[in-house]
Amino acid sequence: MIFDFRDLWTENINFKGLFPFNVYEQLQEYRWCRLADVITTVSEPLARVLEKKHHKKVQIVLNGFDPEDRMNNKQVEKLDSSKINILYTGTIYRGFQNPSPLFEALKSLIEDDYPGISDLLITFAGKNTTEAEKLAEKYGVQSQVNCLGFLKRETILSLQECADILLFLDYNSENGDGILTGKLYEYMFSGTRIWTIGKVNRASRIIEENDLGEVYGNDVEKIKEALKVLLVEKHPGKFSLELLTEKLRHYTRGYQAQRMLDCLNQN
């Protein structure tokens, strides 16, 4: 039997559970881990948490992405082509993910009346975009922030491909290092360059190691300089999906499915 953790269960930083159910869940996690022939999870940091807790070897099987989801996507959506578009897709987890450094950099350029800054548009699509709206108002940049709310996946995939930059918000938490969401892999196979903001965790390092974008942490000055370069470039070049599929083949779901089978066959 394989016990697979796509996210941590009772150690999940986004949801700690409710008493008394969390006590029952702790017991269930211990029980199933004890019975499992193989325990798997999505990253080395999460594996270390589980190994320390359950005293068993934990194998790594990534979430991955199926490139055919893009190849077969017939949905065609466009962002405003008159703008330089930075796009974030997905949920923003309050207290863990924060676009404030980007807004602060944008505010500074607006106050400097930097040439072309009015051409920049930052779009958020997904659940809880109200958090982005509130922060945009706080920094006075709401006129250049667009929140679309929840959209179907086919639409999101299309928008990711036509954006000029994809914004990835890494977790500002010591416990966020091993969180590798499916959204990360969607971004990686989009063909669009990625900017990561937040504490530099494993997700940001994967983007940097594969030369898929830039990692800025929470450094407002670096983000400000990157925005200046973007205003000159306007529309950076794209990566070919065919080349990405070859370069990132070990991040595909097919590769990871085989990895799961290998873990099972070893026991």
State where each predicted segment sits:
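A charged, aromatic-enriched C-terminal amphipathic alpha-helix characteristic of glycosyltransferases
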Residues: 218-222, 232-266
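Nucleotide-activated donor-binding/catalytic signature segment of Leloir-type glycosyltransferases, i.e.
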Residues: 117-126, 131-155
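Acidic anion/phosphate-binding donor-loop and adjacent secondary structure
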Residues: 65-83
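Nucleotide-sugar-dependent
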Residues: 97-100, 152-158, 166-188, 194-205
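Conserved donor-binding/catalytic core segment of Leloir-type glycosyltransferases
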Residues: 78-96, 103-106, 256
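Membrane-proximal helix-turn-helix segments that form the acceptor-binding/catalytic region
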Residues: 19-39
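Carbohydrate-associated surface elements
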Residues: 45, 64
